[in-house]
Amino acid sequence: MKKIGIAITDPEDWTARALITAAKEKGFFPFILDLRIAEVSISSKTSEPATLFKAGEILLSDLDALIVRDVGAGAFEGVSFRFDILRELEAGGVTVMNSPEAIQNAANKYHASYLLARAGLPVPETVAVQSVEAALRAASGFGDAVIKPVFGYKGKDIARVKDGEIRFSDRKTGPGTVEEILEKLLEERGMLYIQEFIENPGRDIRAFVVGGKAIGAIYRKAAAGSWVNNLSRGGSADRCVLAEEQKEIAEKAALAVGTTFAGIDIIEGAKAQTGNENKKTEDKSTGQGSRILEVNGTPSGKGIFDAWGINPAEYILEYLQNIL
């Protein structure tokens, strides 16, 4: 029986539980572990392994595969250490899904935008800067701009700059002038990641891709009065049938970032239809076509399961079963 680890941080998380159940159903022996308690021993004694990787009582190097649901937040050195462990396990022959490189590619919004654009995929116009002057120029040039933390998640700490004001994702207007707020953000982050705001019908799309194939999608609709569509920010989910063009760019986005499974966030543009019907992606040159917003390398499967009854965990474990 193949031994697989499932790295989680919240035992009650829907996706974590779904992965554990699917692993058992596929005949795997799942080891549930938390990378935040992982330890590594390095020795030059011939009587001991050169390197010993443990998480609690689990010997990580004995695993056939490791599925990463969550690495866990924390200080820079701690998070970097966990990714080092994943890289070293991978080098030692453990199949890691998603790979540490892919998770980091997806988590870094700036680098993900670069990879997506390099692959010829449509993305919002984007500027990354390290000065307030450059940030003001970018925001002014876009007219309506969004500033996101490069390593943000769940729609937190997103700011929209429009008409001389900054509104944050909690819908409050930022205190101080735009310049003062940008100075504060730059001091905190060291750089600013700025995108044009894409006018849209009050929703975006989360497509789930496994093994290079889009298995389903949902609309994420913003809460009343909000401009942020994340479910974690009060948004709601509904069924979405992807147009062929949207399916194609979602699958290519997962490949461009290096993910085996991923949540691909797509924004449609203001002219999109507002039903659940198949939509056509408009010509990229019009500025109103579908664009890739982000790639999530550790996505939740709950939204698509609630909307469609599609369980991404089953697809992930089936893919893993086929490659081991």
Swiss-Prot record:
Gene Ontology biological-process annotations: protein modification process
Record-linked Gene3D superfamilies: 3.40.50.20, ATP-grasp fold, B domain
Details of cofactor binding: Binds 2 magnesium or manganese ions per subunit.
This protein's pathway: Cofactor biosynthesis; 5,6,7,8-tetrahydrosarcinapterin biosynthesis
Residues bound to ATP: 148, 195-204, 220
Record has Magnesium as a keyword: yes
Cofactor annotation: Mg(2+); Mn(2+)
Positions bound to Mn(2+) 2: 294, 296
Binding residues for Mg(2+) 1: 265, 294
Documented EC number(s): 6.3.2.33
SUPFAM superfamilies hit by this protein: Glutathione synthetase ATP-binding domain-like
Top-rank EC class of the record's enzyme: ligase
Catalytic activity from the UniProt record: 5,6,7,8-tetrahydromethanopterin + L-glutamate + ATP = 5,6,7,8-tetrahydrosarcinapterin + ADP + phosphate + H(+)
Binding site for Mn(2+) 1: 265, 294
Keywords: ATP-binding, GTP-binding, Ligase, Magnesium, Manganese, Metal-binding, Nucleotide-binding
List of residues binding Mg(2+) 2: 294, 296
One MF term in the entry's GO annotations: ATP binding
Positions of region (Disordered): 274-293
Function of the molecule: Catalyzes the ATP or GTP-dependent addition of one L-glutamate molecule to tetrahydromethanopterin, producing tetrahydrosarcinapterin.
Quaternary context: Homodimer.
Family per similarity comment: Belongs to the RimK family. MptN subfamily.
Name of this chain's protein: Tetrahydromethanopterin:alpha-L-glutamate ligase
Taxonomic path: Archaea, Methanobacteriati, Methanobacteriota, Stenosarchaea group, Methanomicrobia
Gene that encodes the chain: mptN
